[in-house]
Curated annotation (Swiss-Prot):
Organism lineage string: Eukaryota, Fungi, Dikarya, Ascomycota, Pezizomycotina
Low complexity bias locations: 62-71
Organism the protein comes from: Aspergillus fumigatus (strain ATCC MYA-4609 / CBS 101355 / FGSC A1100 / Af293) (Neosartorya fumigata)
Protein name: Pre-mRNA-splicing factor prp46
Stretch list, region Disordered: 62-129, 432-453
One Pfam short name: WD40
Major localisation: cytoplasm
Keyword Repeat belongs to the record: yes
WD repeats: 142-181, 184-223, 226-265, 268-309, 311-350, 351-389, 400-439
């Protein structure tokens, strides 16, 4: 009599299900390979949509074959190189393969590539030059509004300032004494420029007016009409009798200085043209706009040469180096340096977290940036090193919120910095004559790499 092992109903059901899975699961639980990898759909699309281009035309196929053959002919043969080991136990089984020929190790060791032990030259950083710190020299009062524009005369005898009180004032640069006040604008004066070849002073303002003042008679002799809104900036071409203006209507206009005719209308910006600069070589006009772009213009054709879109916020100011073929642009919390004429990016000036309203650079490679909160930073132009950071002081009787830098420029020698501020004063700064590299050392240490963007 056969004896069957006693099992519970649950165990019997579990064994039956397990046996069923062993018998049939291997066949029915697997996904068809063609369905899993989608080969059915791909083969259908190849046949239905790409059957006409399955084979290249004979001319194109022959051209590609020649190009592939030429590439194989130019490629050097790579052969594994082995050498006897030091203990004489046969050839080394090193996995390093080198091109046929003498080893490129140099004096650093036989067969040892120098690139593995030396830092690439691209990451080596130049040590910044020493610059003396700057200190306050003079405070000039007289305006009744924010000082929004400054311009220094070519002979370095006087400078002009334009402010929110709708006046233009001429000041003695050596003494700070007021020499003249020009009235004529009916709104804030936003831009000033002194001609190096004529006794002319040009001004623009939020009243849509662009005026030419004769400094021999102290009267307006020309008006330039065409802007549809406030004019925020202007610049003179260094060699040609051309005036360039830009404003809230988003265009830059090129004027013939003498005939008042509008030569070009440089349109392309989608926001206010906050600043523009002119230079002799291409690009002869550079504009910065609140649409966060910088545009380089071909003056002869009146067209855009390039657009720089690296900034994330509106570009409020530009500065061109007086000797080098480079310039800088400033937006909120960001200053970038560019190389002309294509506008190749060079470096960032990092560390000024403010709305930067003013930029200026002198021949000694000192870059100044002024913020709307009164912060002032001085940089080494070559390396982007910030060697001084100070805060301006609002004049007594002003609010702390009025300690803002609205405009700035160096004089012709580069030894005086003039700033126009929101406390209605003009401040003149100079380098500290008593500072030495020992008393104010350069606290700089190289980093492994430079952040480009």
């Amino acid at each position: 009599m056969d004896v069957f092992p006693s099992t519970t109903p649950d165990e019997a059901v579990r064994k039956s299900a397990k046996r069923t899975a062993e018998l049939f699961g291997s066949e029915y639980l697997l996904v068809t390979p063609s369905v899993a990898d989608g080969s059915i759909g791909l083969s259908y699309r190849k046949k239905a949509e790409y059957s006409d281009v399955k084979e290249l035309p004979p001319a194109l196929a022959e051209k590609q074959a020649k190009a592939a053959a030429a590439g194989r002919a130019k490629r050097p043969k790579i052969q594994p190189q082995t050498k006897p080991q030091a203990d004489g136990s046969g050839a080394s089984m090193s996995l390093v393969k080198r091109a046929a020929g003498p080893a490129a190790g140099g004096v650093g060791g036989e067969g040892q590539p120098k690139s593995l032990i030396q830092r690439p030259s691209a990451t080596r950083q130049q040590r910044p030059d020493w610059h003396p710190p700057w200190k306050l020299m003079r405070v000039i009062s007289g305006h009744l509004g924010w000082v929004r524009s400054l311009a220094v005369e070519p002979n370095n005898e006087w400078f002009a300032s334009g402010a929110g009180d709708r006046t233009i004032k001429i000041w003695n640069l050596a003494t700070g004494a007021l020499r003249l006040t020009l009235t004529g604008h009916i709104s804030t004066v936003r831009g000033l420029a002194v001609s190096p070849r004529h006794p002319y002073l040009f001004s623009c303002g939020e009243d849509k007016m662009v005026k030419c003042w004769d400094l021999e008679t102290n009267k307006v002799i020309r008006h330039y009409h065409g802007h549809l809104s406030g004019v925020y900036t202007l610049a003179l071409h260094p060699r040609l009798d051309l005036l360039v203006t830009g404003g809230r209507d988003g265009v830059a206009r090129v004027w013939d200085m003498r005939t008042r005719s509008n030569i070009h209308v440089l349109s392309g910006h989608k926001g206010t043209v906050a600043d523009l600069k002119c230079q002799e070589a291409d690009p002869q006009i550079i504009t910065g706009s609140l649409d966060a772009t910088v545009r380089l213009w071909d003056l002869a054709a009146g067209k855009t040469m390039g657009v720089l879109t690296h900034h994330k916020k509106g570009v409020r100011n530009l500065a061109i180096h007086p000797r080098e073929f480079t310039f800088a642009s400033a937006s909120t919390g960001s200053i970038k340096q560019w190389k002309c004429p294509e506008g190749d990016f060079m470096q960032n000036f990092e560390g000024h977290n403010a709305v930067i309203n003013s930029l200026a650079v002198n021949e000694d490679n000192v870059l100044f940036s002024g913020g709307d909160n009164g912060s002032m930073c001085f940089w080494d132009w070559k390396t982007g090193y910030k060697f001084q950071s100070i805060d301006t002081m609002a004049q007594p009787g002003s609010l702390d919120a009025e300690a803002g830098i609205m405009s700035a420029t160096f004089d012709r020698t580069g030894l005086r910095l003039i700033t126009g501020e929101a406390d209605k004063t003009i401040k003149v700064w100079k380098p500290d004559d008593e500072a030495t590299p020992e008393s104010h050392p350069v606290t700089w240490a190289p980093t492994l790499g430079r952040q480009r963007y």
